[in-house]
Amino acid sequence: MTAKPDPLIHPITRLSICGLLAAGADWVEFAALRDAAGISDSVLSKQSRVLEDAGYVEVRKGAVGRRPRTWFRLTADGRRAVQGHLAWLAQLEEAVAAAPEPMTGGGDHPGGVPGKSSPGVTRRH
């Protein structure tokens, strides 16, 4: 597994879909995935098609009684992509946590607010 961002699943909607599929049962029904992701039918249809075209998601269509149903599951490639993307996000989180605190205050110096002067300092124009 390589820790690198995956531009295909980086958009939050696709990342949510993949994350829910990775954490869910083998097959997840359309309505359950839509509700868990908090998105509309059309958004799930469009974004799942992108993921399916990339080989990250498998789609199965069928019926329960007379009602048509659609189920999704993450493929092995999709699972690897999610794991790599999450590893990259974890590395990014570690880097941010290890970064020094930014300087605060006014003035025209590094860490100051651009265009703001420190109290008691007159700026000439």
State the predicted function of each range.
Residues 59:
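Short beta-strand "wing" residues that participate in macromolecule-binding interfaces
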Residues 31, 40-43, 74-79, 94-97:
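Juxtamembrane helix-loop transition sites at the ends of transmembrane segments
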